[in-house]
A protein has these predicted regions:
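Outer-membrane beta-barrel "beta-signal"
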Residues: 544-553
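Non-catalytic interaction/targeting regions
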Residues: 1-483, 487-538
Length: 553
């Protein structure tokens, strides 16, 4: 059997690499149009073309089973756009923008028959035609500079448009407030759909505005509003999911989930944008216009603070679950509270403490490690369960988990896991779990377990094998240490151990027990396990398990 990996097929049209040709629309997407440098450019909006915009995009994926997923695209569309001064969202007829959006994904069987499809709509509701897309604004192709006191005027033009000098700007050309994903069976019948709503420009469904802010403190006055002038960008707030509604094939809502967000308390940074424009140059003088604006560089994060899920039943009853989230100064989850508004008894709280919550905590203070969990607790129904992690460093200064403790209902600390020795990579060589000692030795690069010994200590191993073992481990010669134990395994009568060998691709291919039982693992060329065999005393392999995959050629 020869296995095949998934194959990707991309659209046949490729980008034109000729540097003398400009084949992009005003949004920066490939449109197949040829404009030579010698031609006089058009300083206006260039229309996108779907055929060329799809250049080199993913068209289909063929799986080893012979099945296929096909992707269909369409151009972005918007039904509103942001004003040039970034202070308002104005409705407009549905219009086409550059860039692609996913229209459908069709899953086919090996014979080409349709299994299922998912269709996407970007309208405000299932039966509406009005696009929920909002364009970030019109491209600016010319800017006029005017120093009235000197009677100087300068008009700059750009065929590609002028980009804004903003900070933290990653806003797409079109953002969608609502996306509908509909599941369809092989006959084209709807199986129901999900409606997703997101934060976007303007005011969201919770009444919160995510529009950008104008600059201030400028020495520039203008009779015309230019969209490319500096502004404070709030893109960090946009694109967050606000609600997810599930509808059945009859259009009845069966479940809804809503999300609320909050800003962290980090103060924005005041940022200066400055330009120097040469208005006039002669052999004897140069006139330079100096322009400046002040904006803010946002430093806050926009994190989910509440999630509410409602299950809707045919009898009109609902079951609601609320989840509340809080975060620490590093934006890591601190608490997650789950509650039923009608049943306080069901309230459950899960909380976390990290290394950044306790500055100076060793061994992290000198390593800049902020996200290591120190404590994790769960409280519900009057009961509590707490887990505590204690860390250490080995002789090479590498941090590792030293102890794992459990405290049930405020009782005594129960050490469930404790490491007594590590290798140079911080991997545990000797540890105790719930009172049982274990020894494991990794490869010389610290990536694979070569030896695993149950119910034995490293000291007991050294006593049985000899002092050479302690020397190999102290010198980080882990391969030699494993080989020494393997050669003397017959002396270790009271220990349970297993030895492991790996292929170059990190796959386990042989496992040997102390008693001499050898297990072999065979893989296909997709790295899927196809055979596990045992070598018996007559030197013959006996297949224990076989795995077959439905590959098609």
């Amino acid at each position: 059997m020869v296995a095949q990996k998934s194959d990707e097929v991309r659209n046949d049209i490729t980008f034109n690499k000729n540097y003398e040709e400009s084949c992009y629309d005003s949004w920066g997407y490939y449109n197949g149009k040829i404009e030579k440098i010698s031609d006089y450019p058009s300083f206006s909006l260039s229309s996108p073309k779907l055929e060329f915009t799809k250049a080199e995009t993913l068209k289909s994926i063929t799986y080893p089973t012979g099945g296929k997923s096909e992707f269909e695209y369409e151009l972005n569309e918007y039904g509103a756009k942001v004003s040039n001064d970034h202070t308002a969202v104005n409705e407009c007829p549905n219009s086409i923008s550059g860039g692609l959006r996913l229209r459908s994904v069709t899953n086919r069987d090996y014979d080409g028959s349709i299994i299922s499809s998912k269709r996407y709509k970007y309208t405000k509701d299932y039966k509406e035609t009005k696009s929920s897309g909002i364009s970030k604004g019109e491209m600016q192709f010319s800017i006029e500079y005017n120093i009235q006191s000197l009677g100087l005027r300068l008009n700059l033009m750009s065929a590609g448009g002028f980009l804004s000098n903003t900070t933290s700007m990653n806003t797409p050309d079109v953002g969608y407030s609502t996306v509908i994903a509909e599941d369809v069976d092989s006959l084209g019948n709807s199986l129901g759909y999900k409606k997703f709503q997101f934060t976007n420009f303007g005011t969201d469904i919770n009444g919160v505005s995510h529009l950008d802010d104008k600059a201030w403190g400028s020495n520039v006055t203008s009779d015309k509003v230019y969209s490319c002038l500096p502004f404070t960008c709030k893109s960090a707030e946009r694109g967050k999911i606000l609600s997810e509604e599930v509808f059945d094939a009859n259009g009845n809502k069966t479940e809804e989930t809503s999300y609320r967000y909050s800003k962290t308390n980090k103060t924005d940074i005041n940022t200066a944008t400055q330009q120097a424009i040469i208005m006039y140059r002669s052999p004897t003088s140069t006139v330079v216009g100096l322009l400046g604006w002040l904006t803010k560089t946002p430093r806050y994060s926009y994190l989910c603070s509440k999630m509410t899920t409602k299950e809707l039943y045919d009898n009109g009853k609902t079951y609601q679950t609320d989840k509340y989230f809080t975060y620490n100064s590093c934006n890591l989850l601190s608490t997650e509270t789950t509650a039923n508004p009608n049943n306080e008894i069901e309230k459950a709280i899960r909380s976390y403490t990290y290394s950044c919550d306790k500055p100076g905590t060793e061994p992290f203070a000198g390593h800049g490690i902020k996200s290591a969990i120190l404590e994790e607790s769960f409280t519900a129904n009057g009961m509590s369960d707490k887990y505590a992690y204690r860390y250490g460093t080995n002789v090479y200064g590498v941090p590792f988990v030293w102890q794992y403790l459990r405290i049930y209902n405020g009782g005594t600390d129960n050490i469930e896991y404790e490491v007594t020795k590590t290798d140079k990579f911080g991997n545990p060589i000797e540890f105790v779990t719930k009172g049982t000692p274990y020894v494991q030795i990794f490869s010389d690069d610290g990536t694979h377990v070569q030896l695993f010994v149950e119910d034995a200590t490293l000291e007991e191993l050294c006593d049985a094998v000899g002092e050479r073992l302690a020397y190999y481990i102290s010198q980080c010669e882990y391969y030699n240490a494993t080989g020494l134990i393997y050669n003397k395994r017959d002396k270790l009568t009271n220990m349970h151990m297993r030895f492991f060998n790996y292929l170059g691709s990190d796959l386990l291919f042989e496992e040997t027990t102390k008693e001499g039982l050898r297990y072999s693992y065979i893989y296909d060329n997709s790295n899927h396990l196809i055979d596990k065999s045992l070598l018996y005393g007559n030197n013959k392999w006996q297949t224990l398990k076989m795995y077959e995959y439905n590959y098609r050629h």
